[in-house]
């Protein structure tokens, strides 16, 4: 009896164990599938982000092209070239023009700063921003002017000592995400003499609270100028702000004085230090290095000459051409520009990314800077008697990443960067003679508390949504590529042919075969119905009878065109003349090799001038180009 009972219990236990193992294996496979989907979604987000930055960097070559051509065709208009290539000279203007003439009314119920600033003002600002109050333009401008005054006295690289017992915190990109900064201060404490910080660039753009972050950092810097350190990132650049949102944010929050704020901010960026060196061992820079990185050159160049990474130095011929066409004497000379070598040194510092492959080669994803391998890291560190590079610039799923045998650390402080739940944020604490300590976090909201599969669904939905927008902007080119391989005109090609066509046209370096089930229909034999790629999406036409190639071109380059025409609009009226539109479009057409007939452009310009006054509201026109999705929720067939 006893033995039989024991045998039954043993068999029952075996069944329980087997069932538990089956459930465990199923759950592991389930988590692996979710992890793969999350990985693909992040790959899409990052590829498109870098492709956009590549497009932004390509504007640099267009501006050089424009400099050669626009000044020849519009000799009477020197304001545009001045705006693009000449440094702002705020010193020649009375500060009272910006600050003194702006009164703070009694009705203003936001924070009132008292200069000279103290720790109380930092707290006041934090509490006000938590309550979604807006700092008055008078105080914003005063903070910008005061910060500029101190920044101008600082070297290109700030040097910090943690020896013997000091700790310092290093934060990466924040990108306008105020909740992340608040969480860092909550977990790690506010800046002070005993709690120093380095903020490693990219404070602004993308998020909705770039101004609030900038004001908190600058006010903290003014209170603790030797304990809070600010490095310039690639987004501390007025041209980047035009594309990625900070300019728009300022003009919306400060409708009356936004233009003044932008002008002062444009110059303040140029005075931000380009790096920090800790204990003569650790180099903290925003992007990275290259095999030609020379700290001697970087420490001696005049950083304020770098107005924008998109504004390359003028050649002597270009400078002479501008002077010849200007009505008055030129205030800018070649000596007031960076040399090409100096400009490239800063580009590498702000834009480069580490890779596992040895060597140094062009950063084709971003279009600026380089990829640098572990051998390059060792060479630059050894040459300068340094031990480590801490950089930011790249979103990492865990908020940080260590590579190059521990000699390069990436730290990224904006959690949920692409989408809720897409990544953690992190910061680093350093003290002398010890290994870096990493602290991770993630700002939580109602959606972040959802089950993992719902968060992955939401990420995946957003990722494929923006990928489809990329596809529709190249619809004509994609169809031509598909039809080139569809010799029998069946409307179908192989999966390999479809994947090759997608990569050759879009150039996003994505695993197209793995993504195909979300993007296209296949038959039982595995052949791809390539036109199904566009079944659930189209670009809205702002005008009837507009040709598809023109629609796609305008949509594809809408961000670039918006930047270009905002620069042409020197008086910020929102209007440009018909002649300016035609001339600039033809230059754009020639440089980007866009095949649009001049007759189409003339017709387009005439249609855009709705009231026939010779002016065009170009920003309003661009807003008329938008993509229509048939499915707008994560529960759509896209995710089933």
From Swiss-Prot:
Binding of Ca(2+) 1, residues: 569, 571, 573, 580
InterPro entries xrefs: Calcineurin-like_PHP_ApaH, EF-hand-dom_pair, EF_Hand_1_Ca_BS, EF_hand_dom, Metallo-depent_PP-like, PPP_dom, PPP_phosphatase, Ser/Thr-Pase_EF-hand_contain
Catalytic residues as annotated in Swiss-Prot or TrEMBL: 235 (proton donor)
Xref: SUPFAM superfamilies: EF-hand (SSF47473), Metallo-dependent phosphatases (SSF56300)
All copies of domain IQ, residue ranges: 16-45
Superkingdom, natural source: Eukaryota
List of residues binding Ca(2+) 2: 609, 611, 613, 615, 620
Keywords: Calcium, Hydrolase, Magnesium, Manganese, Metal-binding, Protein phosphatase, Repeat
Region (Catalytic): 122-445
Keyword Magnesium in annotation: yes
A GO BP entry: detection of stimulus involved in sensory perception
Binding sites annotated in the UniProt record for Mn(2+) 1: 173, 175, 202
One GO MF term attached to the UniProt entry: protein serine/threonine phosphatase activity
Residues that bind Mn(2+) 2: 202, 234, 286, 393
Cofactor: Mn(2+); Mg(2+)
Pfam families in the cross-refs: EF-hand_7, Metallophos, PPP5
EC main group: hydrolase
Reactions that this protein is recorded to catalyse: O-phospho-L-seryl-[protein] + H2O = L-seryl-[protein] + phosphate; O-phospho-L-threonyl-[protein] + H2O = L-threonyl-[protein] + phosphate
Domain EF-hand: 473-508, 556-591, 596-631
UniProt name for this protein: Serine/threonine-protein phosphatase with EF-hands 1
Cellular-component GO terms for this entry: cytosol; nucleus
Cofactor remark: Binds 2 manganese ions per subunit.
Regulation: Activated by calcium.
Keyword Cell wall biogenesis/degradation assigned: no
Disulfide partners: none
């Amino acid at each position: 009896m006893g033995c039989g009972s024991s045998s039954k219990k043993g068999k029952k236990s075996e069944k329980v164990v087997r069932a538990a193992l089956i459930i465990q294996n199923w759950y592991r496979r389930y988590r692996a599938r979710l992890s793969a989907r999350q990985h693909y979604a992040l790959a899409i987000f990052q590829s498109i982000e870098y492709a956009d930055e590549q497009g932004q960097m390509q504007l640099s070559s267009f501006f050089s092209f424009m400099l050669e051509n626009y000044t020849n065709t519009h000799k009477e208009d020197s304001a545009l070239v001045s705006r693009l290539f000449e440094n702002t000279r705020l010193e020649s203007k009375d500060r009272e023009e910006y600050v003194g003439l702006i009164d703070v009314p009694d009705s203003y119920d936001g924070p009132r700063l008292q200069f000279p600033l103290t720790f109380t003002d930092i707290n006041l600002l934090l509490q006000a921003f938590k309550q979604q109050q807006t700092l008055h333009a008078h105080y914003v401008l005063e903070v910008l002017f005061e910060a500029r005054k101190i920044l101008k006295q600082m070297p290109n690289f700030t040097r910090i000592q943690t020896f013997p017992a000091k700790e310092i915190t290093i934060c990466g990109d924040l990108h306008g995400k105020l909740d992340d900064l608040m969480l860092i201060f909550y977990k790690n404490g506010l800046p002070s003499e005993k709690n120093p910080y380095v903020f490693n660039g990219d404070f602004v753009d993308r998020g909705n609270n770039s101004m609030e972050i900038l004001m908190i950092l600058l006010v903290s810097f003014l209170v603790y100028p030797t304990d809070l350190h600010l490095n310039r990132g690639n987004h501390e650049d007025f041209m980047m702000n035009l594309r990625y949102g900070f300019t728009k944010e300022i003009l919306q929050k400060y409708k009356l004085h936004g233009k003044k704020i932008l002008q002062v901010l444009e110059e303040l960026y140029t005075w931000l230090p380009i790096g920090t060196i800790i204990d003569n061992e650790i180099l903290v820079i925003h992007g990275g290095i290259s095999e030609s990185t020379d700290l001697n050159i970087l420490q001696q160049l005049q950083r304020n000459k770098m107005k924008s990474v998109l504004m390359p130095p003028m050649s002597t011929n270009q400078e002479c051409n501008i002077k010849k066409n200007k009505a008055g004497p030129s205030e800018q000379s070649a000596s007031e520009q960076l040399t090409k070598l100096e400009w490239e040194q800063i580009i590498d510092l702000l834009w480069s990314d580490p890779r596992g492959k040895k060597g140094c080669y062009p950063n084709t994803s971003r279009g600026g800077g380089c990829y640098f391998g572990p051998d390059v890291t060792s060479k630059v560190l050894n040459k300068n008697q340094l031990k480590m590079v801490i950089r930011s610039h790249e979103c990492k799923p865990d908020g940080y990443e260590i590579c190059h045998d521990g000699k390069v650390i990436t730290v990224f402080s904006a959690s949920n960067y692409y989408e809720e739940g897409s990544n953690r944020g992190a910061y680093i604490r350093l003290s002398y003679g010890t290994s870096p300590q990493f602290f991770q976090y993630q700002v939580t909201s109602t959606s972040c508390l959802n089950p993992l599969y719902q968060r992955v669904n939401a990420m995946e939905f957003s990722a494929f949504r923006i990928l489809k927008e990329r596809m529709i902007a190249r619809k004509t080119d994609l169809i031509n590529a598909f039809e080139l391989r569809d010799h029998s005109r069946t409307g179908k090609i192989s999966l390999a042919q479809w994947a090759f066509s997608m990569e050759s046209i879009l150039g996003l370096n994505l695993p197209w075969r793995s993504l195909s089930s979300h993007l296209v229909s296949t038959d039982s034999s595995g052949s791809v119905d390539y036109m199904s790629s566009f079944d659930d999406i189209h670009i809205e036409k702002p005008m009837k009878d507009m040709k598809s190639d023109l629609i796609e071109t305008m949509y594809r380059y809408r961000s670039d065109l918006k930047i270009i025409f905002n620069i042409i609009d020197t008086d910020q009226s929102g209007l440009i003349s018909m002649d300016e539109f035609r001339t600039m479009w033809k230059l754009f057409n020639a440089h980007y090799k866009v095949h649009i007939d001049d007759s189409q452009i003339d017709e387009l310009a005439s249609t855009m001038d709705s009231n026939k006054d010779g002016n065009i509201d170009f920003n309003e026109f661009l807003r008329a180009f938008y993509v229509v999705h048939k499915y707008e929720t994560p529960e759509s067939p896209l995710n089933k």
